Amino acid sequence: MPLFLIERNFAQEVNLDEAGFREIQQINDEVGIQWLFSFLSADKRKTYCLYEAPSEEAIRIAARRLNVPADVIVPVGTIPVNEFRAEKYAMMGPSGS
């Protein structure tokens, strides 16, 4: 399923409790998207969230139902960083030089 990074800007600090988390999960399940990970800014007013979703529109539908912003939605891919590290160490040999 495609990956999307969502930037959300909030007027007040984000404080998610267990009930809020359950509501997010329920709506995400109904819409067919999966919240994978989030970063929260130091001032707790901005999040960057990684989602799997069939489309950008599915993310927007869930955001509207949850009454949360989805200011920027960017389709993203991944960079296999660990593969590069493994290749580097393999080329260096067991002594590390």
Whereabouts are the PLM-identified features?
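An amphipathic, aromatic/His-enriched active-site/gating alpha helix that lines ligand/cofactor pockets
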Residues: E30, A53-I79
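Short, well-ordered beta-strand segments in beta-rich or mixed alpha/beta enzyme
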Residues: F4-R8, F37-A63
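Short S/T/G/P-rich N-terminal loop/turn motif that feeds into the first structured element of a domain
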Residues: M1-E30, L36, R45, T78-S97
